Amino acid sequence: MRPSRRAPDEMRAVSLERGVVKYAEGSCLVKFGDTHVLVTATLEDRLPPWLKGQGRGWITAEYGMLPRATLERTRREASAGKQTGRTVEIQRLIGRSLRTAIDLEALGERQITVDCDVLQADGGTRTASITGAWVALADCIRWMKARNMIKTEVLRTNVAAVSCGIYNGTPVLDLDYAEDSEAETDANFVMTGDGRIIEVQGTAEKTPFSEAEFLALMALARKGVGRLVDLQKMAVA
């Protein structure tokens, strides 16, 4: 039995609310159960120096957690003077994932910066961030289209992410913190709207897992991502 009493293939309640920040070109408040992330997408007429003059744009991301997003207060990284390795890893993952969804040449020589701020953390902050970031990015693209800044289709596919793991010997979908902290195996799957794989991160925390168990996790992930993509489409409709 899962601590949440969910079925093995049951996700937490998920919501994606688009357009929640009036100043940002794109935004989304994403909730995976008790994990809440505010995502904004900012259009900028600048590029990394190495990309200038190449006729294409760029998508980059930043990720952070509010001090009381967790049970005990976490010191702000800005006050510590450096980002943790975990933060750097997650924001690079978000940026990589979103770039697969975009025709960077159609975007033109512009940069979209996606900021993911975790308001409350209960497991799966990176997967929630990626899923909500796609909605914020789509919201930003819509803003650009409304102002005739782009003429062709920029978004190529949906991108969503979900966690899976082996908990008490059973493959389960969308781990919350209680499950993640006790799981024998946990993995994050980032996929496109048609089920292609962008990235897989998987770790045996206690016992090595078999190929059959990995395939069971992937099957759960495909089901979860399919559900998330449906919710994304509803959010941007």
UniProtKB/Swiss-Prot annotation:
Catalyzed reaction equations: tRNA(n+1) + phosphate = tRNA(n) + a ribonucleoside 5'-diphosphate
PROSITE patterns registered for this protein in UniProt: RIBONUCLEASE_PH (PS01277)
Database matches in CDD domains: RNase_PH_bact (cd11362)
Name of the top EC class for this enzyme: transferase
Biological process according to GO: rRNA catabolic process; rRNA processing; tRNA processing
Highest taxon, organism lineage: Bacteria
Keyword tags: Nucleotidyltransferase, RNA-binding, rRNA processing, Transferase, tRNA processing, tRNA-binding
InterPro entries associated with the record: ExoRNase_PH_dom1 (IPR001247), ExoRNase_PH_dom2 (IPR015847), ExoRNase_PH_dom2_sf (IPR036345), PNPase/RNase_PH_dom_sf (IPR027408), Ribosomal_Su5_D2-typ_SF (IPR020568), RNase_PH (IPR050080), RNase_PH_bac-type (IPR002381), RNase_PH_CS (IPR018336)
Family indicated by similarity: Belongs to the RNase PH family.
Subunit structure: Homohexameric ring arranged as a trimer of dimers.
The protein, known as: Ribonuclease PH
Species for this entry: Bradyrhizobium sp. (strain ORS 278)
Gene responsible for this protein: rph
